[in-house]
Amino acid sequence: MANSFSPTEIFDVIVVGGGHAGCEAAITSARLGLNTALFTLNLDRIAWQPCNPAVGGPAKSQLVHEVDALGGVIGRLADATAIQKRILNASRGPAVWALRAQTDKRQYSRQMLQLLQHTPNLALREAMVTGLEIDGDPAGGGEHWDPSQGPAARITGVRTYFGSLYGAKAVVLTAGTFLGGRIWVGHQSMAAGRAGEQAAEGLTEALQQLGFHTDRLKTGTPARVDRRSIALDQLEEQPSDAADRFFSFDPAAWSSGEQMSCHITRTTAATHQLIKDNLHLTAIYGGVIDSKGPRYCPSIEDKIVRFADKDSHQIFLEPEGRDTPEIYVQGFSTGLPEPIQLQLLRSLPGLEQAVMLRPAYSVDYDYLPATQLLPSLETKRVQGLFSAGQLNGTTGYEEAAAQGLVAGLNAARRIRAEEAVHFPREGSYIGTMIDDLVSKDLREPYRVLTSRSEYRLVLRGDNADRRLTPLGRELGLIDDRRWRLFEDKLQAMEAEKQRLEQQRLKVSDPAAPAVEQETGAPIKGSITLADLLRRPGMHAADLVRHGLADAGLPLPVREGAEIDIKYSGYLARQQQQIDQVKRQGRRKLPETIDYASISTLSREAREKLTAVRPLTLGQASQIPGVSQADLTSLLMWLELQQRRSQPSASHLAPTGQAR
């Protein structure tokens, strides 16, 4: 991949792709002072939302809060462009509470473009990147390359479709569904990354020439329907119920514009019969493609086949913006031919006269299995080459944005010869996701879920700033104003918790009878407000209602103090588990350990541990292919060896923090 041409331009960091991962990566790198360029196929489709125009949801909102806590932008833009907000899982515990916002997709894209254009150190270029320029082995070490030997090459730049060369010390690939992208409507298909936009050529082949393995995945999006053709008055309305809730921790980003309602309809027997009669006409069920689609976002065909006992499925009608009649038919993606799609839509109550503005389609595309990456999202084969977003096999804007921030951060640190930042899975959903991606052989699009985290009570959305903003400050991503806001919030929360622990409600106080009636428990003499909060059904909002708390106190402060108090026992136990994991991570591994002789380890773990030879248990946990079960086996082996040896055996004692 050597060349005789001089670069057209030279940058520190080049980001390839202008989606949600690419934008976060480029902004992060530029804010850290690196001369950065963002290359995209279409500057008019920056941070586009080609599927659901929404941000957040279970686990996804936690990711958005975490990105914001680290200085990212997805939360700010979602707040600024939200047209409806709802709290999901409100009846359950705070570990699974989730904020979800419908956004104005065109306004979201416009605001992101403006943000990029006004970010210092950041240049925008509209071009198709088709090649990677490297220094080193052009085959990336070949098929027999051993990761323990280190990278086989170093990135030096990119080449575009029309032959221009751009130099770079680091490159972040965030190509989404555009690599080898092909969209399908029935058995008809065309090369495209998404409807109306060309696929990216050459980059898949460039990666394969460097020794990378690529595979195919599939996703899809439903039809868009003209709002004016729907009998909305016949359908159940779903209004906004959380206009005063925000993703960003920065009050300066809070915005509450005019809210819009969604509506709910359901599939009918006619819908199901149409699908059953025409399954063979889809690309998947017709055997034309076999790419794996997202398990947690199935097509309507998959729902009918997999849940044959259900006679109806809920469908949500969601507006795409304030200035467009387009309605997103959520839960109704399909790969059926266009004429049948219209029949399906008109089989839904309220949509009997529906006008279809855009047909549903499936898209299958090339992706880079993330086991070929380090936890920093840098590729193992090529130093300075990073990958983030849907290219890594994930699905969702939120997952992409989080990876983009991590890749942009570590690309900047690679150039500065600084240590990469690894996010442990016990500290954030970002860490949980990346740990899953780089260590598991995933065969379907990955979506973050609260069930994927062993520590979800600690990894809540409301405390993402407490968990990650100090790190963001240390890394240079949080400015002085944001840091002062964070410190002020912490002080206010601590003061409120102290007040709740000290102030008592006496049985003779005016509010006592109502409180006793609501909680169903008597007040014996007096009770601290903290103990009152610990009673089931009593919340900070109730204290305000009874005149026992300051209504002027910011909602995040009141609710944060409540959660800390109400769930203090559970939080303490989970924190002990996390601390134990951290202590175990500092355990030294003997240099002479024979992994092949530890029969309780999986075969893959024995091979990987022998090749990498980690110094600590924490480093072993970062090795792709070494599972949690393997780590437990290794820890048990260490304990057994310790009992068999002298108590003073220093090589088995806990040591300082592994880096």
From Swiss-Prot:
Compartments, record wording: Cytoplasm
GO BP terms: tRNA methylation; tRNA wobble uridine modification
GO MF assignments: flavin adenine dinucleotide binding
Keyword list, A-Z: Cytoplasm, FAD, Flavoprotein, NAD, tRNA processing
Binding annotation for NAD(+): 293-307
Binding-site positions, FAD: G17, G18, G19, H20, A21, G22
Gene Ontology CC terms, in alphabetical order: cytoplasm
InterPro entries linked: FAD/NAD-bd_sf (IPR036188), GIDA_C_N (IPR049312), MnmG (IPR004416), MnmG-rel (IPR002218), MnmG-rel_CS (IPR020595), MnmG_C (IPR026904), MnmG_C_subdom (IPR047001), MnmG_C_subdom_sf (IPR044920)
Pfam families linked to this entry: GIDA, GIDA_C_1st, SAM_GIDA_C
Cofactors named for this entry: FAD
Keyword Flavoprotein in annotation: yes
Role: NAD-binding protein involved in the addition of a carboxymethylaminomethyl (cmnm) group at the wobble position (U34) of certain tRNAs, forming tRNA-cmnm(5)s(2)U34.
Membership in a protein family: Belongs to the MnmG family.
Quaternary context: Homodimer. Heterotetramer of two MnmE and two MnmG subunits.
Name of the protein in its database record: tRNA uridine 5-carboxymethylaminomethyl modification enzyme MnmG
Species per Swiss-Prot/TrEMBL record: Synechococcus sp. (strain WH7803)
Taxonomic path: Bacteria, Bacillati, Cyanobacteriota, Cyanophyceae, Synechococcales
Gene: mnmG
